[in-house]
């Protein structure tokens, strides 16, 4: 599960960079939402992954 969270976090960061860079100006809001969503998923899966060993 942690690997999925890291994968989606990287995708969200790439989308944010492209959105903030002016390449896809309309996608900026989506990139912000995805970044926050996958950052939260990353943190949650990181802590639950540590508990399971």
UniProtKB/Swiss-Prot annotation:
The protein, known as: UPF0391 membrane protein PA5482
Family as reported in the entry's similarity comment: Belongs to the UPF0391 family.
InterPro entries tied to this protein: DUF1328
Coiled-coil annotated spans: none
Subcellular location: Cell membrane
Membrane topology type: Multi-pass membrane protein
Transmembrane intervals: 4-24, 29-49
Keyword entries, A-Z: Cell membrane, Membrane, Transmembrane, Transmembrane helix
Top-level taxonomic group: Bacteria
GO cellular component: plasma membrane
Species assigned in the record: Pseudomonas aeruginosa (strain ATCC 15692 / DSM 22644 / CIP 104116 / JCM 14847 / LMG 12228 / 1C / PRS 101 / PAO1)
């Amino acid at each position: 599960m942690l690997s999925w969270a890291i994968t989606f976090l990287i995708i969200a960061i790439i989308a944010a960079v492209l959105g903030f860079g002016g390449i896809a100006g309309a996608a900026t809001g989506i990139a912000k939402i995805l970044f926050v969503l996958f950052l939260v998923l990353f943190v949650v899966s990181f802590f639950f992954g540590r508990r399971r060993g």
